[in-house]
Curated annotation (Swiss-Prot):
Disulfide bonds join 56-145. Zn(2+) binds at residues 62, 70, 79, 82. Gene3D superfamilies: Superoxide dismutase, copper/zinc binding domain (2.60.40.200). This is Superoxide dismutase [Cu-Zn] 2. It is an enzyme of class 1 (oxidoreductase). Its main location: cytoplasm. GO terms for molecular function: copper ion binding; superoxide dismutase activity. Keywords: Antioxidant, Copper, Cytoplasm, Disulfide bond, Metal-binding, Oxidoreductase, Zinc. Destroys radicals which are normally produced within the cells and which are toxic to biological systems.
Length: 152
């Protein structure tokens, strides 16, 4: 079993810890929680770069090693890093529990060293008709991020 973790932080008081685990070539399990969010849906993605020198802005675009358009997690045509939305309750806490086969922790398309990003707004899953729908899901600003690091 391979395990990884990302500690999310921001200047806006949003914080959290996201855990990743993968057994063999199976899907990667993503669990954890994020607090300090406004209630509602927030885009949740793996971004290409593990660079936070300019905060979450320097994490680059969504992780997309196969050059596809943005989509929903269940879509065949999607960025590998498109994990859809997380939902924050009235207390501002979003619990994460996702399983995904396009974000491996080993191999050529490993997400180790990349970043997980929480967005200000809902991800329209590429179906919103906005000019940004097919690239970012029109999910708005980046309110928290963390670099995905290998765990022992």
């Amino acid at each position: 079993m391979v395990k990884a973790v990302a500690v999310l932080a921001s200047s806006e008081g949003v914080k959290g810890t996201i855990f990743f685990s993968q057994e063999g070539d199976g899907p990667t399990s993503v669990t954890g929680s994020v607090s300090g969010l406004k209630p509602g849906l927030h885009g949740f993605h793996v971004h290409a770069l593990g660079d936070t020198t300019n905060g979450c802005m320097s994490t680059g675009p969504h992780f997309n090693p196969t050059g596809k358009e943005h989509g929903a997690p269940q879509d065949e045509n999607r960025h590998a890093g498109d994990l859809g939305n997380i939902t924050a309750g009235a207390d501002g806490v979003a619990n994460v529990n996702v399983s995904d086969s396009q974000i491996p922790l080993t191999g050529a398309h490993s997400i180790i060293g990349r970043a997980v990003v929480v967005h200000a707004d809902p991800d329209d899953l590429g179906k919103g008709g906005h000019e940004l729908s097919k690239t970012t899901g029109n999910a708005g600003g980046r309110v928290a991020c963390g670099i995905i690091g290998l765990q022992g």
